[in-house]
């Protein structure tokens, strides 16, 4: 395969003599233009940026004056011109390039300050199709890419947050920039255009209902670098995609240390789980360890919901993540701070609760600003060696399913409510998952076992331990409903559940041996319903 090859010298210091400024986000642009003007830099600009700089009383030249071609088509065409791109792309030390510049009257551009139409913001706000298309920038990305390619000679700035460092460079080096800085800004520029194009590509896929586009690019903006990843020897960073889904990505850290990689992963799992329970129906609390719930409950008040969730497995809850579906109040905060907790996340926090939590300065307190809607569609992704698995979010809700009673005995109304509660929780438990629940409270949770029978046994064991800790005479699973997130392949799993005291079972169904399981349920007077929906989680 033939490739383009050209060795380009890279001078360390390049003096800024001419700058092109064309931005949508005008944060700091006038101040930057002022700093450049004071150094005698010639300013070129376009449209609204030109007006902002000129209004500030600074000398600035409209790009159309150097191209000899006016802005046309509502500004769609203004910088797509050889005079502009030649000035950005010319190799200053190449005699042929210099001759071409001289012949065509092209002036070299040493600095490009460019940011883009707010496509991502318009998309996130739900703009209609024509408006969203109109906010696809064309000239901006072209200038950014041209400048970044020629970073040996051209400095490209795409982020107002970099203006201060750039001005420091000018002050330190007599109006010049260092190659290392230009190189770093070029890398950042290409990352920006890549993310921008990814957002456009993904929007088209959504708008046209293309489930598996030929190219799938998942972009994100760096929110924070982390001390390490899952383990201290792993490097990590947190990127946000821009999806306006309330949760750990959008939450405000009200107090406490920076969230760790594991904190973020666990907090996301906790908040997505607790959002399954509508706050207008009842307060709810979920306690998470290692992305699995160790206790979930509703209650007549938020503090009662927390106490009931904690009662399921108070040992595992130590050092856990607590998620609430209602505003954290003072009474609940007083209870929570009695136990070592890593993170609390809630839709909001009262001032009284903040004053209580502050007594635990290392406790991370997050205000999410709302609850995520479990029914809203979205994507999830997971890396594998050399690949990326992408799927739609599991937004199936048990309330939306037509439950099928498959046993002789139908569940009572209370059993049915407990079944739905357990199935909601089971959706968020690592497979194989078995969840016992009674009266809006998990009684025992078995997670992540290779055998469903083992998950059922572990859940029952957890319930026995909880009963002992609470001084109860019988396990919490006695008279409970139990959920399996996937079908029961054999009757042995059901028999383990019955032995634990469950009287009602909810599962997807679909096994070759469904009838065998149904017969066993009928033999023991158990009520069982099929949901027709599986909730594997890995």
Swiss-Prot record:
GO terms for biological process: 'de novo' IMP biosynthetic process. Keywords: Hydrolase, Multifunctional enzyme, Purine biosynthesis, Transferase. One of its GO terms (cellular component) is cytosol. Its EC number is 2.1.2.3, 3.5.4.10. Gene3D superfamilies: 3.40.140.20, Methylglyoxal synthase-like domain. InterPro entries: AICAR_Tfase_dup_dom_sf, Cytidine_deaminase-like, MGS-like_dom, MGS-like_dom_sf, PurH-like. Pathway: Purine metabolism; IMP biosynthesis via de novo pathway; 5-formamido-1-(5-phospho-D-ribosyl)imidazole-4-carboxamide from 5-amino-1-(5-phospho-D-ribosyl)imidazole-4-carboxamide (10-formyl THF route): step 1/1; Purine metabolism; IMP biosynthesis via de novo pathway; IMP from 5-formamido-1-(5-phospho-D-ribosyl)imidazole-4-carboxamide: step 1/1. It comes from the Bacteria. One of its GO terms (molecular function) is phosphoribosylaminoimidazolecarboxamide formyltransferase activity. It catalyses: (6R)-10-formyltetrahydrofolate + 5-amino-1-(5-phospho-beta-D-ribosyl)imidazole-4-carboxamide = 5-formamido-1-(5-phospho-D-ribosyl)imidazole-4-carboxamide + (6S)-5,6,7,8-tetrahydrofolate; IMP + H2O = 5-formamido-1-(5-phospho-D-ribosyl)imidazole-4-carboxamide. Pfam families: AICARFT_IMPCHas, MGS. SUPFAM superfamilies: Cytidine deaminase-like, Methylglyoxal synthase-like. PROSITE patterns: MGS. Residues 8-158 form the MGS-like domain. Belongs to the PurH family. PANTHER family: BIFUNCTIONAL PURINE BIOSYNTHESIS PROTEIN ATIC (PTHR11692:SF0), BIFUNCTIONAL PURINE BIOSYNTHESIS PROTEIN PURH (PTHR11692). The IMP cyclohydrolase activity resides in the N-terminal region. NCBIfam families: PRK00881.1, purH. This is Bifunctional purine biosynthesis protein PurH. It comes from Rhizobium etli (strain CIAT 652).
């Amino acid at each position: 395969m033939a490739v383009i090859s050209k060795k380009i010298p890279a001078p360390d210091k390049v003096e800024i003599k001419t700058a092109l400024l064309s931005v949508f986000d005008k944060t700091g642009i006038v101040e930057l233009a002022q700093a450049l003007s004071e150094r005698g830099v010639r300013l070129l600009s376009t449209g609204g940026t030109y007006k902002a700089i000129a209004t500030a009383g600074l000398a600035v030249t409209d790009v159309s004056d150097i191209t000899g071609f006016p802005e046309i088509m509502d500004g769609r065409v203004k910088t797509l011109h050889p005079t502009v791109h030649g000035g950005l792309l010319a190799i200053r030390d190449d005699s042929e390039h210099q001759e071409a510049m001289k012949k065509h009257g092209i002036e070299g551009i040493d600095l490009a300050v460019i940011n883009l139409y707010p496509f991502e913001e318009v998309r996130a706000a739900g703009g209609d199709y024509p408006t969203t298309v109109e906010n696809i920038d064309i000239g901006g990305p072209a200038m950014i890419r041209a400048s970044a390619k020629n970073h040996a000679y051209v400095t490209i700035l795409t982020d107002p947050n970099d203006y201060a460092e750039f001005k420091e460079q000018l002050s330190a080096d007599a109006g010049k920039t260092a190659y290392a800085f230009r190189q770093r800004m070029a890398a950042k520029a290409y990352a920006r255009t890549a993310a921008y194009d990814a957002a456009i590509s993904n929007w088209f896929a959504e708008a046209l209902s293309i489930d598996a586009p030929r190219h799938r690019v998942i972009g994100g903006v760096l929110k924070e670098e982390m001390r390490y990843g899952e383990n201290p020897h792993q490097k990590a960073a947190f990127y946000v995609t821009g999806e306006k889904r309330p949760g750990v990505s959008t939450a405000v850290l009200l107090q406490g240390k920076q969230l760790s990689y594991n904190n973020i992963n666990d907090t996301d799992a906790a908040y997505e789980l607790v959002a399954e329970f509508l706050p207008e129906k009842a307060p709810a609390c979920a306690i998470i360890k290692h992305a699995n719930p160790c206790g979930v409950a509703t209650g007549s008040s938020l503090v009662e919901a927390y106490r009931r969730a904690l009662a399921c497995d108070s040992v595992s809850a130590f050092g856990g993540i607590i998620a609430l579906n209602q505003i954290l109040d003072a009474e609940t905060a007083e209870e929570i701070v009695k136990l070592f907790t890593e993170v609390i996340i809630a839709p909001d926090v009262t001032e009284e609760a903040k004053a209580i939590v502050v007594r635990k300065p290392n406790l991370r307190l997050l205000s999410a600003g709302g609850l995520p809607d479990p029914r809203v569609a979205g994507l999830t992704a997971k890396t594998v060696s050399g690949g990326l698995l992408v799927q739609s979010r599991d937004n199936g809700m048990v309330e939306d399913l037509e439950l099928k009673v498959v046993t002789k005995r139908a569940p009572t109304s209370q059993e049915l409510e407990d079944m739905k509660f357990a199935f909601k929780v089971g959706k968020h438990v690592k497979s194989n998952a078995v969840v016992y629940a009674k009266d809006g409270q998990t009684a025992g949770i078995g997670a992540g076992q290779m055998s469903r029978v083992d998950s059922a046994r572990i859940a029952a064991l957890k319930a026995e331990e909880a009963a002992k800790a609470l001084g109860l005479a019988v396990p919490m699973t006695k008279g409970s409903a139990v959920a399996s997130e996937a079908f029961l392949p054999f009757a042995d799993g059901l028999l383990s559940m019955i032995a634990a005291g469950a009287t009602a079972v909810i599962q997807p169904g679909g096994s070759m041996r469904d009838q065998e399981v149904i017969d066993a349920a009928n033999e023991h007077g158990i009520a069982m319903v099929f949901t027709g929906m599986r909730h594997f989680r890995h």
